[in-house]
Amino acid sequence: MVRMNVLADALKCINNAEKRGKRQVLLRPCSKVIIKFLTVMMKHGYIGEFEIVDDHRSGKIVVNLTGRLNKCGVISPRFDVPINDIEKWTNNLLPSRQFGYVVLTTSGGIMDHEEARRKHLGGKILGFFF
């Protein structure tokens, strides 16, 4: 079976494993977008370290969970978000201003909404986590 949205599958696996109280989760297939998204999550401490396993096919990622993640999801379709509309999207997606991040793909790479605002970049919205 062909997977339509690998990022959505990966985030749903992380969500389900976190709800079940697992310490680790195995994601496959591996992609650059998933790795960058996980890097943003790890930078903010929502997940632990992750390891990329090369199985000579599409690859696997083993993610260590910390129990801090409440929810993560993907936004499909990937809407264009200018800099002025980032605030509107964060209000819609996140429960509060104090925590949670919206992940954007910009011309400067994949980053959270705060970094995009600092660098004055708009882009396409990938997903969120809190």
Curated annotation (Swiss-Prot):
PROSITE patterns: RIBOSOMAL_S8
Disulfide bonds: none
A biological-process GO annotation: cytoplasmic translation
Keywords: Ribonucleoprotein, Ribosomal protein
UniProt xrefs under PANTHER family: 40S RIBOSOMAL PROTEIN S15A
Protein name: Small ribosomal subunit protein uS8A
An MF annotation (GO) of this entry: structural constituent of ribosome
Family, as annotated: Belongs to the universal ribosomal protein uS8 family.
NCBIfam families: PRK04034.1
CC per GO annotation: cytosolic ribosome; cytosolic small ribosomal subunit
